[in-house]
């Protein structure tokens, strides 16, 4: 992810990749500060204060570079006097990424390391004459000096093609001559420096001792702090390092050629096979470095500390030391480049001074580590100059893990490119600008995030062929098995369990199951096979059969072998923390079925063995051999299975060792070994004694319990006899009650019959009563009707009597008259 910010004169610069930052830092470090641009006038020297380490490095390079003889001066004296700037040399210390170290490196220690490297590089020159001695050497100047003088003479007229061709020829000769003088350093860091190889057949290496001092001192150092009053010299992040490579370079400013296409493969990244010396020198016309910008990347980092020499009144040699540190952080990589200037002063003048290095922030880009008094226009001036690699000497150190220490290889097609005029591919040199983001129309005033509209620089990187993306060492079956186990753990219900491990252990047995177990891949899941009755797990009750053991005391048991899991469980002590995975309710996996089948198979095998032992037991019974109770008491069957005790056993067939025949060292070694075995055996005997004592106590407890049980059995027998008497009485009572019940049942049946008969009679009487009532009602009606008829007849008779009496009266009256 690239972070774009508006670039101002004081704003932070950006870089696109660690490769590019390393290249730009090298270019900026090798530019003389007094060199103006093509269309600007030269400016005054930068008045900076430098530390003593920089002066020492510069003095060493001056010793190496000012040993030219009269024969060399005859042809190149004028060139030395007229050269506007001298050739430059740098020593690069490269510390690539490694996982075993993560520590801060002191800047002063790295500068001391650069000083020792410069001493090593000075041995390339065959003349040991110091710079202060103007006496002519006893033999003609070396090819390195001739090459340097040729570069100085060709600096004013860099456009001349014939001088460039002559320089290329001399470089090829120098490359062939320096192949046998290549330096190899192998430094192995396993927490500290262990093994070192020789640099040369006759060269002693103080560099390696300083390296070890740097990394050992960095263990107790938590950070780097800049001292008061000193300019910021470098930003040194945390260093992870197993590899150290130092490069000595001589640069020449030829005319700038067109930039190479970004798709070319970098030839210098390929390694030559062991035993071959690759060509170490090349002419690399460099392109103008683009403006660095701030970049945040998670990649291996290359941090360069380059010493820039202060411009002097007369044009002279400029010696620069360049230290490159590949730093890989644990949480990501940062890019930080800093330049520490190195003026020409006597080494002994500022020897006790210490120059502190300030820690650069992770997001700072290339150029942020420069001294604060450097003006932006001076930086732009130095960026306009072009440099090319004229000489390259690699001092490589590898981690010693079976790799070659032959250094980096330059292929033969580099020479063809140089002859054809094509510049070699530089992966850090090319970039393309694309339009940035468009202006926002109406940004919210309260928003805190603003996007830059500056152009975006797109940097080229290495092609795919340069990266090793092969995975032949990955076993697909093992990887898929582990993947399936991890997916299975995600589907399980996880919960923690803590158990207290007692003398009988944890009370569980395990079984490993997983894909690829039959092919020896051993990417297994560890499941609970059985839970011992009465053990710690059984008393706790949370761990069940078929549960998956995910972790034990923080150690993951997913995708491990069964032996590893068993050793982890054996080594636990005291309170043991488990992470248990269990199938969710309603889910039935094939693991439970497999464990069940395994248990059934073991049960079947146990039954077969018991049958065999039963046959042997029958034979023993025929011979009259019986086991006594004492034997049974001495050999109890524990619920946790048989007790497995590991004891170191000496080989029985081992020959008797004679102290006279053996050497004292072997005797001491054998004695220590026997002491260890004796101590282990004593510990196991003590453990067995403790277990035997606990078993004796348990045996006494069992005897007491047996007596109590026998007494309770006698009491229960008496109770049983009483209960039997009660039961007989109850039986007779039950028989009497049964007879009475039968009689009562017979009476009940007779009464039932009488009741039914009476019920029928009652029904008959009720029917007859109904009929009688009906007859009574009919007769009453008939009587009422006859009464009415008789009454009417009486009324008629009475009327007739009264009528007759009247007639009689009238007759009497008439008669009387």
UniProtKB/Swiss-Prot annotation:
Keywords: Actin-binding, Cell junction, Cell membrane, Cell projection, Coiled coil, Cytoplasm, Cytoskeleton, Developmental protein, Differentiation, Membrane, Neurogenesis, Nucleus, Phosphoprotein, Synapse. GO terms for molecular function: actin filament binding; D2 dopamine receptor binding; kinase binding; protein kinase activity; protein phosphatase 1 binding; protein phosphatase inhibitor activity; transmembrane transporter binding. Residues 595-816 are annotated as: Interaction with TGN38. Residues 496-584 form the PDZ domain. Residues 100-371 are annotated as: Interaction with D(2) dopamine receptor. It is found in: Cytoplasm, Cytoskeleton; Nucleus; Cell projection, Dendritic spine; Postsynaptic density. CDD domains: PDZ_neurabin-like. Its main location: cytoplasm. Residues 44-58 have a biased composition (Basic residues). Residues 671-788 form a coiled coil. Residues 417-494 are annotated as: Interaction with protein phosphatase 1. Residues 169-255 are annotated as: Interaction with ADRA2A, ADRA2B and ADRA2C. Residues 291-302, 344-356 have a biased composition (Basic and acidic residues). InterPro entries: Neurabin-1/2_PDZ (IPR040645), Neurabin-like (IPR043446), PDZ (IPR001478), PDZ_sf (IPR036034). Residues 410-425 have a biased composition (Acidic residues). Stimulation of D1 (but not D2) dopamine receptors induces Ser-94 phosphorylation. Dephosphorylation of Ser-94 is mediated mainly by PP1 and to a lesser extent by PP2A. Phosphorylation of spinophilin disrupts its association with F-actin, but does not affect its binding to PP1. Residues 333-342 have a biased composition (Low complexity). Pfam families: PDZ, PDZ_5. A motif (PP1-binding motif) lies at residues 447-451. GO terms for cellular component: actin cytoskeleton; adherens junction; cortical actin cytoskeleton; cytoplasm; cytoplasmic side of dendritic spine plasma membrane; dendrite; dendritic spine head; dendritic spine neck. The PP1 binding region is natively unstructured, upon PP1 binding, it acquires structure, blocks a substrate-binding site, and restricts PP1 phosphatase specificity to a subset of substrates. Interacts with DCLK2. Possibly exists as a homodimer, homotrimer or a homotetramer. Interacts with F-actin, PPP1CA, neurabin-1, TGN38 and D(2) dopamine receptor. Interacts with RGS1, RGS2, RGS4, RGS19 and ADRA1B, ADRA2A, ADRA2B, ADRA2C, CDKN2A, PPP1R2, RASGFR1 and TIAM1. Interacts (via C-terminus) with SPATA13 (via C-terminal tail). Interacts with ADRA2B. Seems to act as a scaffold protein in multiple signaling pathways. Modulates excitatory synaptic transmission and dendritic spine morphology. Binds to actin filaments (F-actin) and shows cross-linking activity. Binds along the sides of the F-actin. May play an important role in linking the actin cytoskeleton to the plasma membrane at the synaptic junction. Believed to target protein phosphatase 1/PP1 to dendritic spines, which are rich in F-actin, and regulates its specificity toward ion channels and other substrates, such as AMPA-type and NMDA-type glutamate receptors. This is Neurabin-2. It comes from Homo sapiens.
